Amino acid sequence: MKYWQAILFFLFGIAFANNLNIPWKACPNYKTYSGRRHYPATGPLRLPFQRPATSCRTFHSKSVEQTIEDVKEQLEDEDLARLFENCMPNTLDTTIRWHAADSHNPQTLVITGDIPAEWIRDSANQLLPYLPLAKSDSPLATLILGAIQTQAEMLIQFPYCNAFQPPKQSFLSGNDNGQSDRVTPAYDPAVVFECKYELDSLASFLKLSYTYWLYTKDQSIFTVKWLAAVERIIQVLEEQSSPSFDEKTGLPKDPVYTFLRNTDSGTETLGLAGRGFPLNANASLIRSAFRPSDDACVLQYFIPANAMMVVELSHLNQMLQASGHADIARTALVWANKIQKGIDQHGIVDHPKFGKVYAYEVDGYGSILFMDDANVPSLLSLPYLGFVERDDPVYVNTRKMILSSEGNPYYLKGKVISGIGGPHIGLRNVWPMSLIVQALTSDDDDEIMSLLDVLKHSTAGLGLMHESVDVSSFKSFTRPWFSWANSLFAELILDLLERKPHLLKKNAS
């Protein structure tokens, strides 16, 4: 970037802040703010109003504000209305760390919440509830397009990394993650916050891109930069479909990606000198070193991420065909079909109690990991991802397995909450995210209403979704500012108003 361009970016950032009338030094740290009750409180649970002051919000959207008012007017339950009012705008209110609204090259940095870095997966999911509004809200569309283009820049540089620092042109300082990771390919810590290779991160970029294009039909998404990011993703699929051993010599192959961290936690690093445990040839699946929880995979053919990639490669084929990029479109479809074949052959397995189910992880040798984790993509989320229908027989069996402590070691039960957790936090904590996904993938009215009741109480009176909560006490929780979970809750309410309005609407028959 030339000196004069840097000056323009700097001045634009100041202008953007001034346009929002943000007195930056006067705004409280939302990590602290979200952990305290603010008034007015409303509803039977007296849930507080947790949005920051208007002048402290990081982005304003008239269409989002109107949606909040429209939904509040429709909802019978005052507690759900307050939760939606807090959760729906949380990403816009608190996590738009930087936005350059250049009509030719918009850029947007979306942090996770209390961690001041952008995760590709989290940021994509944080923006999803706003996409249906983008066509009629030009500033919102520009914000989302900017997020897509910023993600593209990140992935072009370091496609194996999951979390990123503010872009150089934002003039924002980065943060040290406190680790001394040894990773190949090497990365630049000025650009990358963490470099865990997670297949679902790549799928999340494709999902955000497709969903934006689906709602807006905006052809400006197809930039040289965006197409280069897609080609980098295809390159990673090629590299990570390779087995651990050379099929001719039988010797171990040099892995493209390795990760080692000095840690006491087995879920934070990879075995065998950072390569992870062996994968067999001819599995037609893609390796993932880490899960969406940022925990290491045990068996690196991680089925939920492969399923998500099938869906998003099919979507990619659709949008590329429509935009005249037939060659890349065909490549995407070939990969989608190949991975689907691998899931059919290796991902559907026989469980001694639950019958034919989807495995969580496999290695192509016959090893199977039966479990599920709260983070999306998960086995529970397969219908939400668009991979199967809710009544798919294998999914129905899988759902019974993973919503049972007999079939899923991370299905946790306690005095106040039962649901799926995971190794990331430990064996006492359920993630509200898993209850939201359970409701999104359910057709049972009683089950959905029961889940909503638990979700209302899970906030410990703070009116926001938390990362995880102790099974015995809602007052013990992690991460009061976890924007992805707030966006997912908003998605659930919007979904139920459309799919099952009789459960939520006033005077519904």
Curated annotation (Swiss-Prot):
<protein>
    <recommendedName>
        <fullName>Meiotically up-regulated gene 157 protein</fullName>
    </recommendedName>
</protein>
<feature type="transmembrane region" description="Helical">
    <location>
        <begin position="296"/>
        <end position="316"/>
    </location>
</feature>
<dbReference type="GO" id="GO:0004559">
    <property type="term" value="F:alpha-mannosidase activity"/>
</dbReference>
<feature type="transmembrane region" description="Helical">
    <location>
        <begin position="417"/>
        <end position="437"/>
    </location>
</feature>
<keyword id="KW-0812">Transmembrane</keyword>
<dbReference type="InterPro" id="IPR012341">
    <property type="entry name" value="6hp_glycosidase-like_sf"/>
</dbReference>
<dbReference type="GO" id="GO:0051321">
    <property type="term" value="P:meiotic cell cycle"/>
</dbReference>
<dbReference type="InterPro" id="IPR008313">
    <property type="entry name" value="GH125"/>
</dbReference>
<keyword id="KW-0469">Meiosis</keyword>
<keyword id="KW-0472">Membrane</keyword>
<dbReference type="GO" id="GO:0005783">
    <property type="term" value="C:endoplasmic reticulum"/>
</dbReference>
<dbReference type="GO" id="GO:0005789">
    <property type="term" value="C:endoplasmic reticulum membrane"/>
</dbReference>
<feature type="transmembrane region" description="Helical">
    <location>
        <begin position="140"/>
        <end position="160"/>
    </location>
</feature>
<dbReference type="GO" id="GO:0005975">
    <property type="term" value="P:carbohydrate metabolic process"/>
</dbReference>
<dbReference type="InterPro" id="IPR008928">
    <property type="entry name" value="6-hairpin_glycosidase_sf"/>
</dbReference>
<feature type="transmembrane region" description="Helical">
    <location>
        <begin position="4"/>
        <end position="24"/>
    </location>
</feature>
<dbReference type="Pfam" id="PF06824">
    <property type="entry name" value="Glyco_hydro_125"/>
</dbReference>
<keyword id="KW-0256">Endoplasmic reticulum</keyword>
<comment type="function">
    <text>Has a role in meiosis.</text>
</comment>
<keyword id="KW-1133">Transmembrane helix</keyword>
<feature type="transmembrane region" description="Helical">
    <location>
        <begin position="368"/>
        <end position="388"/>
    </location>
</feature>
